Amino acid sequence: MDVTEIAEQTLNTSCLSPACQQQDYAEIEKRYEAERHQQLQTRGKIPDVNIRTNTRFEQFSKDPWLDDSNKRQQIQYHQRRHNGKHHKVLIIGAGYGGLLFAVRIIQTGAFTADDILMVDTSGGFGGTWYWNRYPGLMCDVESYIYMPLLEETGYMPRAKYASGPELRVHAERIADTWKLSNRAMFGVTVKSLDWDEVGKHWSARGLVLDYEKDQSKKASLHLSADFVMLASGIFASPKIPDFTSILEYHGHMFHTSRWDYGCTGGSPENPKLCKLGDKKVGIIGTGATAIQVVPHLAQYSKELHVFQRTPSAVDKRDNHPTDPVWWNKMLQSEGPGWQKRRMENFNAFTGNEQPQPAVDMIADGWTSMPSFSIIGGSPESNATDYLHRMKAFDFPRQERIRARVRETVHNKEVAEALSPWYPGWCKRPCFHDHYLAAFNRPNVRLIDVRQSGIDHFTPKGLVADGREHEIDVFVFSTGYTTSRSSPGGRADIAITGRNGLTMEHKWQNGLATLHGVITRDFPNLFFPGPSQAGTCLNHTYTLDQLATHVAYIISKTLIKIGAADAGYSPRVVIEPTKEAEEDWAVQVLARAATHGALSQCTPGYYNRDGMASAMKSLSMEDKMKLGRMVSWGEGIGSYMDQIVNWRGQGELRGLEIHCVD
C-alpha cells in the first residue's frame, strides 16, 4: 500500500472531493503557521542551569542508584585496577552504543575483551536505561528490534514494548555474555582527549568518583589508548531550564532521569508512588517522557499540575505480552539473521523506501507513518514534490490524532489545548493508551503556557497563566542538553587532535568526515555520527551498523598490515584522506535539502528551538557549514548501500594508514 492509499483511508469522510480536501488542507496549514508564528514570538530560548556547578541542582549530576555497598566496592576495585594504564581500545560510554562497539570488534577476532576498557559516568551498564528509572518507562520502538543482540543472546523480550528495568538488565546480559563486566570502569568523567603525535595514541584525562565519600571526593583519571570510540549517547546530561527565581522555590525538585523514589515512594520495579497522596505535584514538560510519567503521577498524587508548552501527538500504543508460541514459530520460520531483517523491514516503512516490503512485520503506529521520513530521510527526499506528498499523508493523520483527543478528553477546552497543531514530524510522535485519559481525573489540571510561558518561581510554586500555582514537588521532564554539535561537545569532552586542532573548531568550520564515523587529524578516534551518517527511528539499528562498520575498518586495516590475530596488533594509525572526507561532505550536502522542512515546525529540539527558521537570513557560507552537520538525507537504507558497497570493494578507499611498529 503506498502513501496515497494510506492517506485516503484516514481522510475525513465528510470531505472526500479533491477540492474540499485542498480547502481543508489550506485551513490546517494556516493554523499550523499561526501556531508556529505565535511560539516563535513568545518562546525565548531559556538558558540551562549548570547542574555541575549550581549547589541547588548538583544532586542531578550524581548517581542515585548505587545503594549497594558491595557494588560500590566492586566499582572502586576496577577504578584502581584500570586507572593509569594503557589500553588497546577505550570506549567512552557503557550503554547499548558502547556495548555494540565492544561486541562487534570482539567478533572480528582481532581483539578480545581484555583488550577493551569501557568507561562511563554512571555506576553500571545501560546508558540512558541506567539513568532513567521513572515510573512507566518503556521503549517506544518495538523491543524485538530495539533491544540489540537478541539473536546472539537468545533472549525473548517480555512484551512488544519492553520496560525500563528489562532494558537495563539486557545491557548487563550483553556485558556478561561477552565477558565485558570486568572491563568497565564506572564513576568516570572524561574531561579531555588529546592525540599524542609522538606516541601515536590518545591520552584521556578526567575525574574518578569515590563512592565511599558520597560522590563528593574525586581522584584524577589518566588513561591512554590506541583506539578510542565515543559512545556517550545523543543526550549528555539532564536539562533544567534556568527559570526566573527558580532558586527561591523551597519545595522538592527532581529531574525524570534522576527520579527520587525517596520523595515519591515506590521503586523502579514497583512504582507505587505512595508518598504523593497528600502532595500537589507539578510536572514541567509534555514530551515523550512525560507521556509515560503523567498517568502514574495522576494515579497517586493529591493534585497533579501539568505545565505544557507544546502538546505531543499521542496515538494508541496497544502493548501486549510476547506470546512464546508465536516467538518460537517466528524464530523457526525466519531463521538466522531474523533480527536484522526485521529491523530493516521497519526501516523500509518508516523511511518510506519504495517499493515497500510485501509484509509489515512490526505493524504499529510507526510503520503506518511514512511522513516521519522527513526527519531521517528517504531515497525520494530530494524530489521536488516529496514534501507535498508527505503533507498529503500527514494532514489526515494529525487530524485523526486530534479527533482521538476530542473523543477521549471530556473537557473541550482541555482537549483543544492537548491537540497538536503542527506537522507530525515536528515533535517526536508518542504512543500511549492512558495519557489522554489521565486528564479526565478530577485531580489533574492542565496549565497551557504556550503563550505566556512560565513567568517565575516563588517560594511556594510558580506563576504561570496569570496566577500562582502552589506546588509541593516539581518534576522536570525537560529533556537533555543538546546544544553542542560535535561528538566531543555533546559528551562535554574537550578533544584535541593533531597540531592542536579541536573537534569543536572543526565541526563549526567546515566539518568533514568519512561516512560520519572518523575525521582527519583525529586518528584512531571513532564516533557514531549523527552528523554525516545515516539515522533512523530505531537508534540501536544505527548504532549497531556503525559499530559493525568501525569494526570492519579496524580489523581490515590489521589484516592489511598482517596483524589480524588477537594478541598481536602492532600499532597502526588510521584516518581519512582530506580528499575522501571532503568528497563525503559534498555528498551529504547534496542531500541536505530534505531537512529544510523543519523550518516550518514549531520550536523544538528537532529544529534547535526554531533556529531552522532563521536559515534564510544566513550567508551562503554559514548555510554550507550547517549543511555539513546534518545526517545523510536519503535515509538509512541509502546510507547502508553506500557503506556496504564501500566495504565490498575491500580497498579501504579514502583511508590513510600508517604502521607504527
From Swiss-Prot:
Report the gene knockout effect: Completely abolishes the production of novofumigatonin, but accumulates asnovolin J.
Q: Which InterPro entries match?
A: FAD-binding_Monooxygenases (IPR050775), FAD/NAD-bd_sf (IPR036188)
The first-level EC class reads oxidoreductase
Catalyses: chermesin D + AH2 + O2 = asnovolin I + A + H2O; asnovolin J + AH2 + O2 = asnovolin A + A + H2O
- Name what cofactor the protein needs: FAD
The entry marks the following residues as binding NADP(+), namely M138, C139, D140, T286, G287, A288, T289, A290, I291, Q292, R309, T310
Q: Which residues are glycosylated?
A: N12, N382, N538
Task: State the pathway, as annotated in the record.
Answer: Secondary metabolite biosynthesis; terpenoid biosynthesis
Report one GO cellular component: membrane
Q: Which family does it belong to?
A: Belongs to the FAD-binding monooxygenase family.
Q: What is this protein called?
A: Chermesin D/asnovolin J monooxidase nvfH
Q: Which organism is it from?
A: Aspergillus novofumigatus (strain IBT 16806)
- What lineage does UniProt assign to this protein's organism? Eukaryota, Fungi, Dikarya, Ascomycota, Pezizomycotina
Q: Which gene encodes it?
A: nvfH
